[in-house]
């Protein structure tokens, strides 16, 4: 297949050939000297050529079962050959070896080996980020393991370094799925839409992507939009049967569960019709049968419901929901014994099924067995998905009180209608289910997971584990338990054995029956099933319905995880979606990561990566063992059990072939409960369990336990001993010593350190399961992970990055290949395992910063790799003829264009306005050293003005713009300048423009320093803020009535002589206690546009009295040079507030400064965090599944205190002006009734420009539109402003150089391709242009669709999006807005101005 993306470098291939020849000579010399060596595998020239084009971009497109056996064999041979040579070279080979090894293992779906090889490549290659194929492969591996946080980062970086990457559609698809699981629905929709417009091949069809969009609407409870999207999709031609069945199933269940879709009778009628049609398309869907049963049950058709449930059990026995619903029907039919057995089957399959436990408790209570009822209710409350914990707690308390009042012994003497809960497990149906489940699980372990193409697995002889108890043994166990006090020693021994076997059996079932939480949807995701069961009573005249035994499911063709069907287009197939909300299984700790269940026994050892606060990609705590030991055993004993394929995992390849890795012991990553079956290595995709409030917080705490430790702790057994070095986490220093608790926090960059993952957890201290490499060769495993070396010395790694250039201070006990610096702004240069990085990072703005080397150039390698590129297969980026860095910023434009013709693409095709050589931007690390706790509540810089002269005093401007002052409060400004604030009062606004539009945010009234969930049970970061619209007149009415209501409440309090309690709008002293919910709802009027100088002439004129540096328009304001209106930035916006109105946490657009004046009459409370800590807040947002840039969040002050983040906190009174400096993070709450006005300002400083450009690049990485068009602004600045600051001048000149080069290069490419460029000059005040698809700024050359050009609507695309929608640009015209001569003139005339004379004081 045609390769794409990063081209193969001829020069690299030639060098590799020479290296290969040298290596052969060395081996020959070794043999001649008498060394005995085994014959190593070798590749022919033809094989090397065939392997040349294979890399991660073919993942999902190579089918080994379709004439692919030779390819698979070749890849296997290549892997063996590489491993052999690496072993002989003792790991000292070219870094590209490991990258290729990662690609080959990825294509073979050997994920542990692929990850290890990619990690090794990362550790050796300082500019790894230039290799898009590497980043893509790494992202696929993370995606496979549902490590979504890291997969998202890797995929975003691919698109950043290579926007035209040929697998961009695959990336957008996966990003859409991951953001959906993370409940970031806006981002999810954006990426699904980006995938749809891309015409490149993809493993999913467009119809399947459209299904995801429809399901996204359903997840958001936008049911009418979802219904419309589903119905529209049904009209698609050539729709596959599987997709059609899934859509109909969704529509059927939506009509059953959503009240908005009509009255009950109509809804149920439609629901049944849709489900019946779905079953016509896919008769084997157990889930559709289950839904149909629920519909029949709700309308009283009991017989039909039983038939449907029976069909569901036949198709997929392991469904706790189905068994629970059967129990409800039996209970309604007054058949308690049958109901009991059905409920027991449900909780057997899913120990955390709250609904089944509650129904079982109700059953026992109705049979007057309160002790058993209490046990069931307690189990229900322990479930994470219990929605009525308080009600159950009250019921338990009531029943316990009743028991206390009963005469002693009365319960023992009473005949029981039902067996006790302990005895119920050995009843015939549950016991048979237990036995079958154990047998099936055993069978699964011995069966290839061959589900591609809908093939069923071959019959496998049932084997029952020694611990799989038969019904007879279960009965014997209960008898022994009942007579525990009277047993002889032999019987006690037997009891102990049976109990231990019973525990093992339960744990195994819990691991294997994640399917209890799933239902097949045919595609990826489905609706969340309402776990509350039908409450309608069924007439008692219904005939008794015997509970017959269900057929065995061990027959061929039936799989525990329900049958799956392959989708038409490749690796994603029909999968399963959780019924009801995500559940945990009993005492076995389970975390839904994405939708895969990672089960463990109280240990974190079975998750690939763990972290607490890490914002970037993995980084292990590393223990380097002595090279004399067997490092592969010590290092990998425990850390990565979750990476292994285990029985019943859905990690098999397209034909069910398992990767070459060994199978771990009992713990494995299980992909049950997923929305898409894993074919071609893609992990199962997310389901919708969010609609019931159980959003899959997939890696928010990054622990494998539901209640276990929050990180990995070095136990006594796992503590490094002897010749070891423990590597401290470097990106998030909290002051602990290097050997302190090794919680994996900082996970910067892309990869875990491969040198060791030897952090044992208490439960698995002695485990010897294979780790990352799963290699049969321990020496090779050790080499691939990085050999242990004792010559690690201190060193520095000082680098420049395009975001926050930083310097690392020299520290001991550090390891070079740690990617920690990447999380900050520096680029790591991990050339070898002997090099060192650092423990701390300081911002360029700090007094300790310095710029030592650029991108690692000048770094010495302590390990010289032997040139042994055995395959002549190089996946390096194309050779860099002339680095952009070598082009001076001072030559003329003619020299620049001449140089640009030689530059080529420089290996990249990105449009970063920074240097080519800079890696993708990263959030900054928390400043180091951390502030002491007594410095975390600093005083707010405040200036009191007494008269007009004070306001215009030059040092005021300097004080506000000083980067060391994140915020300044200018008190008494309105009085000093005699501003008429009454012009902005509600009364005046109503009189001026009462029908003017107001955006309204509906919020919850809470204390300013707290943010609780709607129930008031826990503090959260998500801030409820739902958008709607109204008019100034209507909001004014609400504002006034709110004030009147408050007065009335205050008077009532006084009249009742109640003690005055703290107002809800002020801070509370009881911050740690539970708040009573629900909270009162309030409305906040925001973003009221005052840009129209005709409507708001008086108001805008009044603001011209302000000092020049805070005015809306001034020569020294960068935003005044944009040349067009940016609403709310270079125009005024008004805010109308009632107490409790919140402006959630944010930084200003593109990190510009902002001005805010309180009109009054009430106060506002402000919370401010310095710019250098935004990376920490970004981490918290990621941890809480919130989008830092676009989400609504309110920081938890306790979290910030623990993370050593300083918070400025102050009150803004009427007439006070708050200056928010560049990049400052802030959030605001109104204390009283007030109005505010605000706008942005861009001081003409290097700091402001630098931060604006950094955010421009970060926005590009995050697929967020930059409101300020920085390229357009930079050219306007060059035209309009004389710059005397050398730093600011150089940054602007760099931007001009970059864009001049890009315009020229693109121009020449279009002319060479025969594409006509049409002149379309800019008009006055014409806004800057953005791509209508990806929203990046488009400068000079606009790609406009033919249709929009003829209609003069001009729908603009960037070059990359244009090529994705039309490969040869035949559907586009190219419009040119600037003549190259004009740009050259601006560039040449922009020179450094002489410094201004210093102002006299």
Curated annotation (Swiss-Prot):
GO terms for cellular component: histone methyltransferase complex; nucleoplasm; nucleus. Zn(2+) binds at residues 1331, 1334, 1358, 1361. The modification Phosphoserine is found at residues 769, 829. Expressed in brain, heart and spleen. TPR repeats lie at residues 95-128, 132-165, 169-203, 207-240, 245-285, 286-319, 321-353, 355-387. Residues 918-931 have a biased composition (Pro residues). InterPro entries: Corepressor-Demethylase (IPR051630), JmjC_dom (IPR003347), KDM6_GATAL_sf (IPR046941), KDM6A_B-like_C-hel (IPR048562), KDM6A_B-like_GATAL (IPR048560), TPR-like_helical_dom_sf (IPR011990), TPR_rpt (IPR019734). Histone demethylase that specifically demethylates 'Lys-27' of histone H3, thereby playing a central role in histone code. Demethylates trimethylated and dimethylated but not monomethylated H3 'Lys-27'. Plays a central role in regulation of posterior development, by regulating HOX gene expression. Demethylation of 'Lys-27' of histone H3 is concomitant with methylation of 'Lys-4' of histone H3, and regulates the recruitment of the PRC1 complex and monoubiquitination of histone H2A. Belongs to the UTX family. This is Lysine-specific demethylase 6A. It comes from Mus musculus.
């Amino acid at each position: 297949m045609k390769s794409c993306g990063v081209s193969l470098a001829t020069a690299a291939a030639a060098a590799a050939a020479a290296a290969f020849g040298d290596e052969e000579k060395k081996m020959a010399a070794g043999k001649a000297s008498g060394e005995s060596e085994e014959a190593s595998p070798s590749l022919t020239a033809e094989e090397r050529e065939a392997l040349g084009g294979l890399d991660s971009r073919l993942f999902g497109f190579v089918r080994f079962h379709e004439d692919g056996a030779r390819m698979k064999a070749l890849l296997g041979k290549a892997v063996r050959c590489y491993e052999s040579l690496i072993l002989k070279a003792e790991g000292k080979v070219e870094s590209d070896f490991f990258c290729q090894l990662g690609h080959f293992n990825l294509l073979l779906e050997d994920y542990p080996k692929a990850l290890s090889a990619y990690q090794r490549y990362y550790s050796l290659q300082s500019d790894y980020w230039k290799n898009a194929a590497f980043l893509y492969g790494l992202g696929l591996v993370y995606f496979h393991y549902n490590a979504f946080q890291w997969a998202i980062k890797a995929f975003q970086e691919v698109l950043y370094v290579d926007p035209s990457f040929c697998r961009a559609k695959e990336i957008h698809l996966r990003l859409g799925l991951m953001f959906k699981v993370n409940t970031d629905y806006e981002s999810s929709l954006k990426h699904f839409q980006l995938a749809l417009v891309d015409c490149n091949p993809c493993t999913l069809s467009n119809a399947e992507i459209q299904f995801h969009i429809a399901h996204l609407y359903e997840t958001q409870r936008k049911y009418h939009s979802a219904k419309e999207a589903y119905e529209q999709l049904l009209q698609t031609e050539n729709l596959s049967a599987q997709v059609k069945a899934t859509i109909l199933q969704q529509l059927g269940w939506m009509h059953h569960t959503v009240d908005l879709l009509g009255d009950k009778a109509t809804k149920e009628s439609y629901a049944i019709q849709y489900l019946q049609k779905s079953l016509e398309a896919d008769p084997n869907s157990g889930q559709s049968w289950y839904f149909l049963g629920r519909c029949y049950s709700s309308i009283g058709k009991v017989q039909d419901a039983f038939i449907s449930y029976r069909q569901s059990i036949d198709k997929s026995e392991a469904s706790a929901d189905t068994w629970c619903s059967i129990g409800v029907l039996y209970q309604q039919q007054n058949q308690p014994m049958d109901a009991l057995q059905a409920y027991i089957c449900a909780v057997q399959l899913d120990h955390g099924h709250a609904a089944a436990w509650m129904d079982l408790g109700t059953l026992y209570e109705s049979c007057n067995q309160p002790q058993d009822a209490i046990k069931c209710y307690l189990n229900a409350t322990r479930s994470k998905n219990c929605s009525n914990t308080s009600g159950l707690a009250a019921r338990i308390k009531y029943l316990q009180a009743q028991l206390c009042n009963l005469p002693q012994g009365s319960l023992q003497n009473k005949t029981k209608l039902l067996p006790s809960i302990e005895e119920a497990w050995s009843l015939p149906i549950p016991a048979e289910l237990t036995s079958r489940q154990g047998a099936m699980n055993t069978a699964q372990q011995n069966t290839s997971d061959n589900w591609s193409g809908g093939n069923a697995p071959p019959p496998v002889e049932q084997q029952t584990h020694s611990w799989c108890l038969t019904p007879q043994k279960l009965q014997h166990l209960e008898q022994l338990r009942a007579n525990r006090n009277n047993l002889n020693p032999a019987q006690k021994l037997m009891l102990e054995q049976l109990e231990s076997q019973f525990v093992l059996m339960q744990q195994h079932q819990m691991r294997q029956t994640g399917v209890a939480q799933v239902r097949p949807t045919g595609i990826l995701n489905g609706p969340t099933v309402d776990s509350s069961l039908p409450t309608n009573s069924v007439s008692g005249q219904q005939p008794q319905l015997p509970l017959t035994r269900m057929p065995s499911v061990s027959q061929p063709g039936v799989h525990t995880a329900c049958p799956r069907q392959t989708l038409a287009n490749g690796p994603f197939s029909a999968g399963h979606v959780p019924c009801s909300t995500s559940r945990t299984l009993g005492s076995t700790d389970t975390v839904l990561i994405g939708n895969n269940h990672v089960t463990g026994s109280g240990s974190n050892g079975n998750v690939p990566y763990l972290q607490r606060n890490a914002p970037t990609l993995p980084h292990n705590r590393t223990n380097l063992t002595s090279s004399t030991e067997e490092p592969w055993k010590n290092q990998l004993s425990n850390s990565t059990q979750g990476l292994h394929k285990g029985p019943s995992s859905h990690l098999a390849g397209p034909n069910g072939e398992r990767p070459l890795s060994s199978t771990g012991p009992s713990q494995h990553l299980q992909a049950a409960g997923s929305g898409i079956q894993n074919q071609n290595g893609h992990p199962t995709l997310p389901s919708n369990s969010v609609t019931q409030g159980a959003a899959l917080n997939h890696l928010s705490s990054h622990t494998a336990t539901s209640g276990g430790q929050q990180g990995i702790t070095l136990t006594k057994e796992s503590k490094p001993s002897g010749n070891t070095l423990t590597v401290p986490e470097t990106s998030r220093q909290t002051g602990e010593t290097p050997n302190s608790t090794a919680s994996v926090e900082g996970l910067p960059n892309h990869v875990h350190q491969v040198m060791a993952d030897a952090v044992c957890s208490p439960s698995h201290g002695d485990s010897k399961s294979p780790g990352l490499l799963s290699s049969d060769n321990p020496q090779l495993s050790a080499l691939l992970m990085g050999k242990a070396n004792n010559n690690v010395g201190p060193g520095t790694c000082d680098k420049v990055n395009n975001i926050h250039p930083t310097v690392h201070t020299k520290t001991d006990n550090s390891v070079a290949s740690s990617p920690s610096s990447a999380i900050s702004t520096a680029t790591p240069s991990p050339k070898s395992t002997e090099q060192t990085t650092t423990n701390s990072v300081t911002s360029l703005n700090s007094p300790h910063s310095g710029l030592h080397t650029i991108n690692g150039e000048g770094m010495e390698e302590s390990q010289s790799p032997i040139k042994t590129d055995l395959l002549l297969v190089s996946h390096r980026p194309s050779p860099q003829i002339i680095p952009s860095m070598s082009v001076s910023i001072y030559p003329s434009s003619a020299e620049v264009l001449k140089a640009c013709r030689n530059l080529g693409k420089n290996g990249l095709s990105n449009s970063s306005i920074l240097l080519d050589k800079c890696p993708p931007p990263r959030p900054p690390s928390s400043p180091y050293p951390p502030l002491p706790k007594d410095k975390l509540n600093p005083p707010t810089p405040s200036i009191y003005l007494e008269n007009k002269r004070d306001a215009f005093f030059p040092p005021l401007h300097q004080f506000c713009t000083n980067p060391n002052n994140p915020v300044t409060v200018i008190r008494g400004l309105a009085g000093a300048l005699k501003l008429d604030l009454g012009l902005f009062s509600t009364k005046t606004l109503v009189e001026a423009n009462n029908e003017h539009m107001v955006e309204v945010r509906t919020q919850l009234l809470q204390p300013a320093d707290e943010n609780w969930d709607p129930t008031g049970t826990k503090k959260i970061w998500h801030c409820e803020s739902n958008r709607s619209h109204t008019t100034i007149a209507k909001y004014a009415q609400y504002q006034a009535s709110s004030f009147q209501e408050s007065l009335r409440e205050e008077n009532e309090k006084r009249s009742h002589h109640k003690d005055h309690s703290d107002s809800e709008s002020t801070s509370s002293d009881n911050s740690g206690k539970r708040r009573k919910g629900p909270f009162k709802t309030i409305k906040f009027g925001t973003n009221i546009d005052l840009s129209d100088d005709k409507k708001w002439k008086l108001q805008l004129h009044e603001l011209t009295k302000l000092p020049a540096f805070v005015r809306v328009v001034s020569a020294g304001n960068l935003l005044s040079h944009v040349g067009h209106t940016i609403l709310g930035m270079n125009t005024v916006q008004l805010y109308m507030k009632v107490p409790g109105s919140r402006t959630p946490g944010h930084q200003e657009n593109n990190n510009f400064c902002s001005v805010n004046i309180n009109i009054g009459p009430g106060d506002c409370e402000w919370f401010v965090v310095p710019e250098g800590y935004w990376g920490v807040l970004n981490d918290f947002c990621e941890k809480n599944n919130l989008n830092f840039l676009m989400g609504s969040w309110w920081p938890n002050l306790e979290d910030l205190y623990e993370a050593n983040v300083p918070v400025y906190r102050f009150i803004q009174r009427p007439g006070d002006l708050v200056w928010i400096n560049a990049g400052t993070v802030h959030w605001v709450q109104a204390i009283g009734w007030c109005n505010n006005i605000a706008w942005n300002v861009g001081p003409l400083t290097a700091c402001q420009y630098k931060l604006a450009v950094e955010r421009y690049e970060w926005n590009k990485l995050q697929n967020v539109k930059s409101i300020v068009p920085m390229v357009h602004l930079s050219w306007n600045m060059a035209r309009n402003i004389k710059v005397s600051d050398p730093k600011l001048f150089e940054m602007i000149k760099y931007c001009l150089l970059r864009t001049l080069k890009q315009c020229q290069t693109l121009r020449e490419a279009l002319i060479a391709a025969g594409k006509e460029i049409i002149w379309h000059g800019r008009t006055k005040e014409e806004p800057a242009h953005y791509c209508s698809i990806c929203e990046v700024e488009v400068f000079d050359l606009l790609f406009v669709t033919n249709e929009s050009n003829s209609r003069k609507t001009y729908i603009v695309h960037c070059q990359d999006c244009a090529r994705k929608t039309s490969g040869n640009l035949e559907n586009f015209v190219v419009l040119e807005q600037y003549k190259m001569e004009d740009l050259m003139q601006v560039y040449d005339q922009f020179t450094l101005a002489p410094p201004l004379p210093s102002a006299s004081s």
